[in-house]
Amino acid sequence: MKELFLIIGAPGSGKTTDASLIAQADATNITHYSTGDLLRAQVASGSELGKTIDSFISKGNLVPLDVVVNTIVCALKAAPTKTIIIDGYPRSVEQMMEFDKVLSEQNEICLKGVIEVRVSEEVAKKRVLGRNRGADDNEEVFYNRMKVYTEPLNEILDFYQKKKLHFIIDGERTIEPIVADMKELIKKIQSI
């Protein structure tokens, strides 16, 4: 059975970088998918689906539920390793509930943990505006993305806390201790 870890955090929390470094360090055992990268790859392809996705991403809004779930399920099925890390998901209560439903209807993938990379809004804003990754990294879009992230957050955290799947990593440190702590946490969870 494949073991899935979801990494959540505010825009600029470092969740994608953290997950990517963990997977790169253990590529034979861990596959990393970023929801954002999966969606941006569709946009870059120029497909009709990509154009639909772009109309949401460019404004900092959520992509429709069915598109996101289908994108993720395809990625999970294609994963070449036992351990899979997906960052940036879920971003809404609806995504969480639909994904939980999809996972409960199959026996190939087990959600082992939801790791929150926690940072303050101030740190997140400084990081996002400093990285200049694309058109979706400006102040107006940042505040919209923060709102989109924080509005459902308590309900998402409550849901996973009740399932004893929620874990927190302090994301305000330098990258090395964050990645080391996350690696250690994943190993600990896998051994339970």
Swiss-Prot record:
Residues 34-63 are annotated as: NMP. GO terms for molecular function: adenylate kinase activity; ATP binding. Residues 130-136 are annotated as: LID. It is found in: Cytoplasm. InterPro entries: Adenylat/UMP-CMP_kin, Adenylat_kinase_CS, P-loop_NTPase. Pathway: Purine metabolism; AMP biosynthesis via salvage pathway; AMP from ADP: step 1/1. Keywords: ATP-binding, Cytoplasm, Kinase, Nucleotide biosynthesis, Nucleotide-binding, Transferase. The keyword Nucleotide-binding applies. ATP binds at residues 12-17, 131, 173. Gene3D superfamilies: P-loop containing nucleotide triphosphate hydrolases. It catalyses: AMP + ATP = 2 ADP. SUPFAM superfamilies: P-loop containing nucleoside triphosphate hydrolases (SSF52540). One of its GO terms (biological process) is AMP salvage. GO terms for cellular component: cytoplasm. It holds the Pfam family ADK. AMP binds at residues 35, 40, 61-63, 88-91, 95, 133, 145. Its EC number is 2.7.4.3. Consists of three domains, a large central CORE domain and two small peripheral domains, NMPbind and LID, which undergo movements during catalysis. The LID domain closes over the site of phosphoryl transfer upon ATP binding. Assembling and dissambling the active center during each catalytic cycle provides an effective means to prevent ATP hydrolysis. Monomer. Catalyzes the reversible transfer of the terminal phosphate group between ATP and AMP. Plays an important role in cellular energy homeostasis and in adenine nucleotide metabolism. Belongs to the adenylate kinase family. This is Adenylate kinase. It comes from Campylobacter jejuni subsp. doylei (strain ATCC BAA-1458 / RM4099 / 269.97).
